[in-house]
Amino acid sequence: MPSHRYRSVFDRVEVPLTDRTWPDQRFSAAPLWVPVDLRDGNQALAEPMDTARKTKMFDLFLRMGYKEIEVAYPSASQTDFDFVRSLAVRDDIPEDVTISVFTPARPELIERTFESVEGLPNVLVHLYTATAPAWRDLVLRGSRAEVLALIEDAAGLVAKLADQRLGTKHGPGAGRMRFEFSPEVFNLTEPDYVIEVCDRVTEIWDACADRPVVHNLPATVEVATPNVYADQIEYMSRSLARREHVILSVHPHNDRGTGVACAELAVLAGAQRVEGCLFGNGERTGNVDLVTLALNLHAQGVDPMIDLSDIDAVKAVVEECNRIPVHVRHPYGGDLVYTAFSGTHQDAISKGMAHHAARAAELGVPASQAPWDVPYLPIDPADVGRSYQGVIRVNSQSGKGGIAYLLRTHYGVDLPRDFQPGFSKVVQRATDEHGREMTPQDLWELFRTTYVVPGEDGAWKLTDTAFQEIEGGGHRVEATAVRADGTVIPVAGIGNGPLSALTVALAKAGIGFEVVDYTENAVYSEHAVSEGADAVAVCYIRARVEGREVWGVGMDTSVLTAMVRAAVSAVNR
C-alpha cells in the first residue's frame, strides 16, 4: 500500500489545545438533535426524494419529537423549493419546531432561499462556505482575506433580508428567524482563521440572548481520530466571542467509521447541537447516525428526548424514503442486533432474562420498568418495540441454553437441565446436515419426533393401562404390552408408586427398565401445544434400558398417561 502518499492530520492542521478538559466530562442531558436527512442525506441519494417522500420523512421527524429540522437546499432544485413552500401552507407544524434551510454564500442563492421560507413562522437560515486551504485554493480560488470578505458579504445579506422580512430588526417576531453558519471542512481549517471568520459572522448577525447564532463545525471529511476532533471543538468553545450567545454545533461524517465517537466526544468538549441522519445516510460513508447517538444515551440512563419506541416503524419510513436498506447489523435498528446464535451467548441471555423477570417480581414492578442488566443485550429490545422472539435463534453454532429458551418461551416446555445436552446434540446433527437456521417450530417438531412420538408409536406399546392405589399406600398397574410383531403380553406390577409399579410391569414383558431420573411440568394452553386443553403434562424419564441410558418424553392431559408414554418412549428409543 502506498501509505507514503498521505500525511498525518497533525501535518495538515494545527491542533493548539493542550490543557483539554473534555475527558473528565460526563453525559447528563441530550444535545439538540437536528436531522439533515432531507437536505444533506437527500443530496447523497441516487434517486433524490420527491415531495411525497420528503413529506413522509418530515412527518416522521415531527412524531419522533425533533424540534429543529433541516428540510431543504431551496436554491438547488425546484423540488426542494416547492417542498419548503408546501410546509409554509401547513397548519399542523408545532409552534416549537424550527425549519432550517441551507444556502451557499452566493447572493442570488441566498435571495432564492428567502423566497422559499416566506410565510414560515420559525426559520433558521443556514449559510455555509468552505474555509480549509485546499478548498480555498482549488475550489474558491481565493486567499484567506478574500474568502472572509465573501463570507462577510453573504452574512450581511442574510441579516438584511431577515430585517426586511421581519419589518424591523427588533420588531414583533424578530426572534423567529435565526441564523447558522458552517465553515465547511472546519476540521482542516487553521484554528486562528476559523475563529476570525466565526467571530466576524457573530458580530454581523449581532448574536444576543433573543437570537443566538449557531456555529456549526463540520468534520466534512473525517481525517483524524475522535480525540483530535474533540480537541478542536473544545478549543473553539473556549475561544469564540460572545460564547454565551453562540450555540456550538457539530456535523460529523463517517469516513473513518468513527462519526458517532466524534459526535459524542464533541458534546463532552462543549458542543450543544448535533446534525446527522437517521441510520447514518449521507455522502460517501454517511453522516453521523442520530439513532445510534440517541440510543447510546438511552443505554447510559440519559433521556435522548427523541421517541424511538418503535424503531422498526422508523426504519421502514427511512428505507422507503431513501430507498436504501438498513444493514441487519446496524446498531440498535438492524434485524439481527438483538439476536444470538452462539451457544455461550444464548445461555447467558437465557439466564439473564430469567433473572430479570425474577428481579422485577421481587421489586413488584413490571419487567419493562425493572433495572436492565442482561448479558449481551445493552438495552431491553422492548424499549424500541422489539419482541423477545428473535433474541435467540438456533443454527449449528447454538448451544443447549438457546434451544431450551426457545422451547420454553414459544411452547412452555421447560427442559430439565440434564436433558438439554442430549437434545442439543440432536439439534447439532440436524443443523449440520441441512446447514440452515432452525425456527422454534423446527425445534418443536424435532423434539416431538425424537422424544414424544416414540412413546406413542414404536416397537412397544402399552394399552389398557390402569393404575390402582392399594392398601399401605402402594400402587398396582395392569396393562397390555404389544410388540410391533403383534405379540400381546398382559403385564402387571406393584410398587411404592406408579412409576415403580410400571417398572415391575415392564420387567414382566422382558424389558429391563430402571429409572434414573424423573421430571414433570405443566404446559398451559397459551403455548398451544395441544387443542382444547387448559394444561398438558410433560413427563421426562431418564432410564437405563437394557443397560443403556436414554431419555423418554410423554405428553398428555393425564399425568399418569404422560408418565407411561415417557417410559415407553425411553424403551423404544
Swiss-Prot record:
GO terms under biological process: L-leucine biosynthetic process
This protein's UniProt keywords: Amino-acid biosynthesis, Branched-chain amino acid biosynthesis, Cytoplasm, Leucine biosynthesis, Magnesium, Metal-binding, Transferase
Keyword Transferase included in the entry's annotation: yes
Subcellular location(s) per record: Cytoplasm
PROSITE patterns noted in UniProt: AIPM_HOMOCIT_SYNTH_1, AIPM_HOMOCIT_SYNTH_2, PYR_CT
GO MF, one annotated term: magnesium ion binding
Domain Pyruvate carboxyltransferase: 31-312
UniProt catalytic activity: 3-methyl-2-oxobutanoate + acetyl-CoA + H2O = (2S)-2-isopropylmalate + CoA + H(+)
Binding, Mg(2+): D40, H251, H253, N287
The protein's Enzyme Commission number: 2.3.3.13
KW Flavoprotein (keyword) present: no
Required co-factors: Mg(2+)
Top-level EC class as recorded in UniProt: transferase
Pathway the protein acts in: Amino-acid biosynthesis; L-leucine biosynthesis; L-leucine from 3-methyl-2-oxobutanoate: step 1/4
Region (Regulatory domain): 454-573
Domain of life: Bacteria
Pfam families: HMGL-like, IPMS_D2, LeuA_dimer
Quaternary context: Homodimer.
Family as reported in the entry's similarity comment: Belongs to the alpha-IPM synthase/homocitrate synthase family. LeuA type 2 subfamily.
Stored HAMAP family: LeuA_type2 (MF_00572)
Listed name of the protein: 2-isopropylmalate synthase
Provenance organism: Catenulispora acidiphila (strain DSM 44928 / JCM 14897 / NBRC 102108 / NRRL B-24433 / ID139908)
Gene name linked to the record: leuA
